C-alpha cells in the first residue's frame, strides 16, 4: 500500500466496468484516483462515492478523450487537485458505436491515447508510468482473425499500441515507463455482451478455446498490479 499512498492516477473510462473496478482497487492501496467519464456523471460520481466511503480519495472529471481541450483539462485538474500526476491508465476504448464517423475508432483508440500520453508526460515526474489496456484480439490482429464487427476496434487499438511504443524513447528521456496489459474477451463487459448478441455462443467458444476468460474484476486486478510491477518498459 505504501508504494501508492499519495500518488495520483488518472484512469480513462473508469465510470464503469474494468476501469471502475481498477479505480477502486488502486484507491484501496492509497492512491488518489481521477475517475474519467465521457457523459454519465451520475455513474462516475457513484464510483467516487464508493471510494470515499471506503476511506479513499477520488474525483470525477468529464472528458471526451477525442477532444484535446478536454484532455488538457483532465490532466490539469488532476495536478491542481492532488498536486501531482504519477500514473496514467489508458483504459477508455470503443469503436463499435454507430453515428460517430468512419474514423471514430482510430481517433479514439490511436490518436486520443497518444495525445493524452503526451499531455500527461509533460506533468509526470521521473519514475512515472503509463499503462495501456488492450485486448488479445487487438494485440494479435496481424496474426489472428477476429469478428468483422470488432475489426475496426482491434485494428485501431493495435495502431494505438504501436503509436505508444514508438513514443517510448521520448518517454524514457523523461524517466517515464510504458506497460501494455492485454487480455482475451472479458466476461461481463459491454463489448463482450454485444459480440455475443451478434454471434450467439461467441463467449462460450472463446472460453473453450482459451480455457478461461477473465471476469471484469479479475482483469482489473491484473491492470492494478502492472501500475507498480517491476517490468521493463514496453
What are the residue ranges of the model-derived segments?
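The beta1-alpha1 cofactor-binding region of Rossmann-like NAD(H)/NADP(H)-dependent oxidoreductases
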Residues: 41-42, 62-74, 110
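Catalytic Tyr-X3-Lys loop
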Residues: 99-121, 127, 131
Amino acid at each position: 500500500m505504501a508504494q501508492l499512498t499519495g500518488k495520483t492516477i488518472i484512469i480513462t473510462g473508469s465510470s464503469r466496468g474494468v476501469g471502475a473496478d481498477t479505480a477502486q482497487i488502486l484507491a484501496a492501496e492509497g492512491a488518489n484516483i481521477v475517475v474519467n467519464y465521457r457523459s454519465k456523471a451520475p455513474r462516475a460520481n457513484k464510483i467516487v462515492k464508493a471510494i470515499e466511503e471506503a476511506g479513499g480519495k477520488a474525483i470525477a472529471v468529464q472528458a471526451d478523450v477525442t477532444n484535446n481541450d478536454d484532455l488538457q483539462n483532465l490532466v490539469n485538474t488532476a495536478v491542481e487537485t492532488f498536486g501531482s500526476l504519477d500514473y496514467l491508465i489508458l483504459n477508455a476504448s470503443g469503436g463499435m458505436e454507430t453515428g460517430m464517423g468512419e474514423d471514430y475508432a482510430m481517433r479514439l483508440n490511436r490518436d486520443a491515447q497518444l495525445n493524452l500520453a503526451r499531455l500527461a508526460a509533460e506533468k509526470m515526474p521521473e519514475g512515472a508510468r503509463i499503462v495501456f489496456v488492450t485486448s488479445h484480439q487487438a494485440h494479435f490482429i496481424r496474426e489472428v482473425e477476429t469478428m468483422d464487427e470488432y475489426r475496426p476496434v482491434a485494428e485501431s487499438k493495435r495502431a494505438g499500441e504501436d503509436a505508444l511504443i514508438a513514443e517510448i524513447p521520448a518517454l524514457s528521456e523523461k524517466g517515464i515507463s510504458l506497460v501494455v496489459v492485454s487480455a482475451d474477451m472479458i466476461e461481463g463487459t459491454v463489448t463482450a455482451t454485444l459480440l455475443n448478441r451478434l454471434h450467439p455462443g461467441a463467449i462460450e467458444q472463446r472460453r473453450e478455446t482459451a480455457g478461461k476468460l477473465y471476469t471484469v474484476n479479475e482483469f482489473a486486478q491484473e491492470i492494478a498490479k502492472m501500475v507498480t510491477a517491476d517490468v521493463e518498459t514496453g
